[in-house]
Amino acid sequence: MVKELLTFEEVSFAYSSSSPVIERLSFTVFENEIVAILAKSGSGKSTLFRLITRLESPDQGTIVCHAQGKIGYMPQQDLLLPWLTILENVSLPLEIQGKDKKEAKIIAASFFNRFGLVGTESLYPDALSGGMRQRAAFLRATLTSETLLLLDEPFASLDSLTKTSMHHWLVSMWEKEKRTLLLVTHDIEEALLLSDRLFIFTNQPLHGFTEVQVPPDLRRKMETTEKMEQQRSSLKKDIRALLIEESLR
């Protein structure tokens, strides 16, 4: 039976006396799925993540989250501290959670092979490529949470070749780790490639949305046939038409 991991029920939120950012928003995210969130800049996506991580509390409605431990967060910029080595950066959240520094490093180091980071332990962030830095940031977020990761346009700043490589890598990691991922992206192709479902927000404040189910035979399939490409192209066309239609209203 598929378990509910995160539920928003009629959630509303506004900063002080300003207009609502989120208004009567309801949705459910299930365990071990990847949900992509498509919305225009400034629409309230960051506020949505702040509510999920409990940095903000809703003015109305309820948020139920069954994630074990803390919630992992990976922003567009890797935010690796330049004066710390990669191992020190990755183990830092474990130290903040109360682990002894030596123990934290041992735990973090045990994941470096799985995440393709062996050999970077003693290097500083400036010595790594953009893709490798994002791997380190993803590992850091993974160690923060056992079940739920929030990814805020994590690959937007990467070139197309590195982004494609990271897509392959993320899928392989998800298949091994089986965590629930919420992915904010402006890239329709990325959303269709990686996710089980898309939440397409076209209004402000965030309220209703269009949900798109990605066909099971298209989800996270890196090697595709002509038929699969046609299916993805058709879905992409429909989503783009929806976004254009709503932007003209």
Curated annotation (Swiss-Prot):
Indicate where this protein is primarily found: membrane
Binding positions (ATP): A39, K40, S41, G42, S43, G44, K45, S46
* Pathway field: Cofactor biosynthesis; thiamine diphosphate biosynthesis
Question: Coiled-coil regions in this chain?
Answer: none
In the Enzyme Commission scheme, what number(s) does this protein have? 7.6.2.-
Per UniProt, residues of the ABC transporter domain are: 6-228
Any one GO biological process: thiamine diphosphate biosynthetic process
Q: Which family does it belong to?
A: Belongs to the ABC transporter superfamily.
Q: What does this protein do?
A: Participates in a thiamine pyrimidine salvage pathway as part of the ABC transporter complex ThiXYZ involved in the import of thiamine degradation products such as the formylaminopyrimidine N-formyl-4-amino-5-aminomethyl-2-methylpyrimidine (FAMP). Is likely responsible for energy coupling to the transport system.
- Give the multimer and partner information: The complex is likely composed of an ATP-binding protein (ThiZ), a transmembrane protein (ThiX) and a solute-binding protein (ThiY).
Q: What is this protein called?
A: Formylaminopyrimidine import ATP-binding protein ThiZ
Taxonomic lineage: Bacteria, Bacillati, Bacillota, Bacilli, Bacillales
Q: Which gene encodes it?
A: thiZ
